[in-house]
Amino acid sequence: YGMKQKGFSLIELLVVVAIIGILAAVGIVAYNGYTNAAKRNTTISNHNTVKKFYQLMVTSCAGGIVEKFELKRSSTAKEIVYCPLNAHANINSLEYHFMYEGFANAYGTTPRLVIKGCYETAWQKKNNHGCVSLTAPDDKTLKLTTYYLDQDKNSQSLTDTVTIE
């Protein structure tokens, strides 16, 4: 009888394992790059959404289009924000509204997307990427600051100011 070999040799199995390892390593690097880009793009989009939302409120009040806004205060309760707007008073309202609208920090570093002063310390600037920080230098000015990581994982920031007319 001639014996027929069934199965693979050790060398063949090692080659297959090596190929799978190389593909996995390449895939992980590509996946990390993709997720980092998605976090960065989502963070920039979130910053712009908060800015445009407040700009719309300011413009609507200034133009006499509306006298008040209904913002979410919880999953079931609404908060009425009246014109004229006050930047100091509106920060808390915006925090809750965006939280209950389902907006989240893409980096997961803070419990909410919009937070008053989430970059006040050096530690926060280094670790709270993705948070849209709202501050009010005065009653007529709302300042938005957001930190994110660029493609080289360096910290970058966006800063915008909305002025109440």
Predicted regions: what is each one?
Residues 1-2, 56:
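Short, contiguous, well-ordered secondary-structure segments
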Residues 2, 35-36, 47, 108:
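General helical secondary-structure elements
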Residues 36-65:
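Membrane-proximal N-terminal amphipathic helix
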Residues 4-35:
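N-terminal single-pass transmembrane signal-anchor helix
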Residues 8, 31, 57-60, 142:
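Broad hydrophobic/π-residue packing in well-ordered secondary structure
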Residues 24-30, 53, 80, 133:
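Short, low-complexity cationic-aromatic patches
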Residues 59-165:
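Periplasmic/extracellular, small/polar-rich flexible segments of pilin-like filament-forming proteins
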